[in-house]
Structures are given as structure tokens and as C-alpha cells.
Amino acid sequence: MASRTNTSSYKRMFGGERPAMVRSTYSSRQYSSPVRTTSRVSYSSASSASPSIYMSKGARVRSSGPLPRLATETLDFGLADAINTEFKTNRTNEKAEMQHLNDRFASYIDKVRFLEQQNKILIAELEQMRGKGSSRVGDLYQDEMRELRRQVDQLTNEKATVEVDRDNLGEDIERLKEKLQEEMLQREDAENTLRGFRQDVDNASLARLHLETKVESLQEEIAFLKKLHDEELAELQIQIQEQHVQIDMEVAKPDLTAALKDVRQQYETLASRNLQESEEWYKSKFADLSEAAARNNEAIRLAKQEANDYRRQLQSLTCDLEALKGTNESLERQLREMEDNFSMEASGYQDTIARLEDDIRNMKDEMARHLREYQDLLNVKMALDIEIATYRKLLEGEESRITTPFPNLSSLTLRETMKETRPAMDSLSKKVVIKTIETRDGHIINESSQNDDLE
């Protein structure tokens, strides 16, 4: 006899081994000898620890106790905020796929019930066929079990496909979030540039006001200098006219006293001396006035030149101011357009965020419902597996009792069975599978599995 352990999705889903089957073959008949196996399945996570499930299979299974229930991890759906809007487009497809899986599982349950009826029929046939030789009940049972295992594997593959689609949707969500962050950064850069332009406009306005004030002060100073120069010229002209009149009067007086020649001569001498002094004073005064006029003319020329320079600077600044006004108007227009665009984009992003939040809430509810349904299905499947194991043990017990009417072969069968069963019993042990998952902010940061064999 050969001991074989089938490894399939059963192990991946429930973390345990399939019950070992030990076959004893004699001539053309096949008999299944039950081997007692014990398996323990335990799941644990970083956030919560769920109770373990202990299931013992032996030659007899008592059905009076409550059915074991598979423990599931306590899921924190608040960590699933990373799921994005792409789920909405695939939600209907996933729902249809889950409904299809539910229908297939319902058909699987119907088939199991049908197998129960077939088992009853086979038990009746076994009662009739006792003493008539071996039957192909074991082969039929194995064929049905292989078919059921194939269906379970197919369901597992479909489940893996759905999980891959879910991971792809998560990647799309991350890509959209990165794009949203880039758009927000571009908007901040544009706002910073706009603030810089506003500062430049303010500085240009202050410079223009300062230059206008300076031009006004220079114009007032030029007007004051002109007025002062005109007043000085008027005073000089008045002084020159008074001196001419005085000189004429002093020269004419000697002409009135024809009788007094001596006095005339004295006055003539005095007049000539006064005239000479007046001429010298006039020349010196005229030189001073000419020098002052030259200085004033130079000052006026410099003032005019400076005024012309200021006028040119004023014109240049006026042109710059007009250009800055045009630039300011253009920037303000661009600012209004950008604000309108950003407001529309922000409203669109807000709508997208609201839609994403609605989709996330819906997906959370949908995931919770699917998990509850999956838990119920796992519980039903566990109960069905226990019932199938019970019926299998009953069938094996019936087959083992068929061998009792053959006294000549009993010792040989017993020896072969014991010989093949002992190594299988020695190799079987209690296995504990501990799976630990640590999550943070909705992301799995650590996942580990530990297998412990209990002798």
C-alpha cells in the first residue's frame, strides 16, 4: 500500500493538510483503511487574535456537538482609504463575478447533497453486496472527490484573478493621487510667481511716486532761482539808473553858477574825481554783476540741463510706467483667468474627491458584505467537509466490515494494513499554522507564517 497526500488549494485556503488515505489492495478489490489525523488551523494578526479551530477526524465523528466555525481576521476597514475611483467602474463586474461564484458554490452544495443521497444508496448497495466480493465504491468516491477538488481549485484561481484586479486598481489609485499632488504643486508655483509680480508692480509704483515728487521739487527750485535772478537783475538796473541820474545832476550844477568860476573849477575837479570814482565803482560793480550774471547763467544752464535730464528721465519713467501698467493689466487678466481655471479645477477635484469617497464607502460596504458571505460560505464548506469526512469514515467502516466473511484472508489483510498504517501513523502529527499580518495606515508592512508540528 502507498500513502499519498494531495496538495492543492485546500492547503492554501485552510492552512492544513488533507486527511491521509491509506489504501490496502488485495487482488482486484480496493479497501480504504481510515487513519486518524488531527489538524489545527490558527490565524492571528497584529491588530487582533482570533480563536483557533481544532478539528479531529477519527474512525467515528460525533455530530452531537456544534459545528466548528472558521476564525477570520478582524479587518479594519478604516485603513482602506487608499482605494480609488477605478473601483467604481469594476464594481459591477466584481459583483457579477461574486454572484457567479456564489451560484457555483450553491451548485457545489447541491452536488454535495446529491452525493449524500448517493452515499445512502451506496450504503444500501453495500448491505446487499456483502459477501459478493469487492465493489468500485471507493473508486467512484475518489472520482467524485477529485471532481470536487478540481472545482475548489477552479474557484481558488478565480479568486486569485479577482485579487490581481484589485491590486491593479490600487496602483491606478496611487497614480491618480500622484498626479493630483503634481497639479497642486504647479498651482502653488503659479501663485508664488503672481505674488512676485505684484511686489514688482508695487515697487514700480513707489519709484514713480518718488520721482514725481523729486521732479516737482526741482521745478519749484528752478522757479525760485529764476525769480531770485530776475529780482537781482532788477535791483542792479535800478542802481545803475540812479547812479547815472546823480552823476548828471552833479555835472550840471557847475553850469548854473557861471559867476563863480573858482567854485566851478573846484566843483569840476570834484566832479571829475567823483566821476572817476563812480566810473571805477561802476566798472567794479558791473564786473561783479557780470560775474554774478555769468554765475547765474551757468547755474541756469546747469539747472536747465538738469531739468532736461529730469524731463528725459520722467519721460523714460513714464514709458516704463505705461509698460508696467500694461504688464500689470496683462498679469491681472492672467491672474483672473488662472483663478477661474483653478476654481473650476478645484471644484472638479472636489467633485472627484467626493465621488471617490462615495465609491470608497460603497466598496467598504461591498467588501464587508462579500467578507460576510465568504465567511458564511467557509463555515458551510467546513461543515460540509466534516459531513463528507463522516460519510467517508462510514463508508470505510462498511468496507472494512466486508472483509470479515473471508477468514482465510483476514490475517493477511490485517498484517498488510498494520504494516502500511504504522508508518503513516508515525509520520502524522498535529500541525499548527500561525499567520501574522502587521498593517499600518492601510498598508501591509509585514507578513509571516509559522508552521509548528506537535508530536
UniProtKB/Swiss-Prot annotation:
It comes from the Eukaryota. One of its GO terms (biological process) is intermediate filament organization. One of the most prominent phosphoproteins in various cells of mesenchymal origin. Phosphorylation is enhanced during cell division, at which time vimentin filaments are significantly reorganized. Residues 87-122, 145-236, 294-398 form a coiled coil. Residues 399-455 are annotated as: Tail. Its main location: cytoplasm. Residues 1-87 are annotated as: Head. SMART domains: Filament. Gene3D superfamilies: 1.20.5.170, Single helix bin, Vasodilator-stimulated phosphoprotein. Keywords: Coiled coil, Cytoplasm, Cytoskeleton, Intermediate filament, Nucleus. Residues 88-122 are annotated as: Coil 1A. Residues 145-236 are annotated as: Coil 1B. One of its GO terms (cellular component) is nuclear matrix. PANTHER family: GLIAL FIBRILLARY ACIDIC PROTEIN, VIMENTIN. Vimentins are class-III intermediate filaments found in various non-epithelial cells, especially mesenchymal cells. Vimentin is attached to the nucleus, endoplasmic reticulum, and mitochondria, either laterally or terminally. The central alpha-helical coiled-coil IF rod domain mediates elementary homodimerization. Homomer assembled from elementary dimers. This is Vimentin. The lineage of its organism: Eukaryota, Metazoa, Chordata, Craniata, Vertebrata. The gene is vim.
